[in-house]
Amino acid sequence: MNANEEFPIEVSVEDVDALRKSDTDFILLDVREQQEYDTARIEGARLLPMSELRNRLGELEPNKDDHIVVQCHHGGRSMQVTQALRSVGFTRVQNMAGGIDQWSLKVDPSVPRY
């Protein structure tokens, strides 16, 4: 089994919640903009806006072999970033389907919707 088979391109918000509760080591990468992050965020998420990815990709290089779950508002930007990271050799990267909006609806209603 290759890494992409082991790590499907998408993961549900429920599965991400289970990862967090199991203390599984992974990075939750928030690719929204700072203003969005200030409005609503998942505790422990690391902000790296999609608009800055090209210039800041080197910050992720030490994590190239780590499990990274990418999230945004609804899942569109995070899917683009997931695909971009996979295209440059990050093999354990997944998109959180539905983004923080689905997180608010299905996992943690205390996270504001916007």
List PLM regions with ranges:
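Rhodanese-like catalytic fold shared by cysteine-dependent sulfurtransferases
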Residues: 1-27, 34-67, 76-114
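Short, surface-exposed ligand- or partner-binding patches at beta-edge/loop junctions that are enriched
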Residues: 71
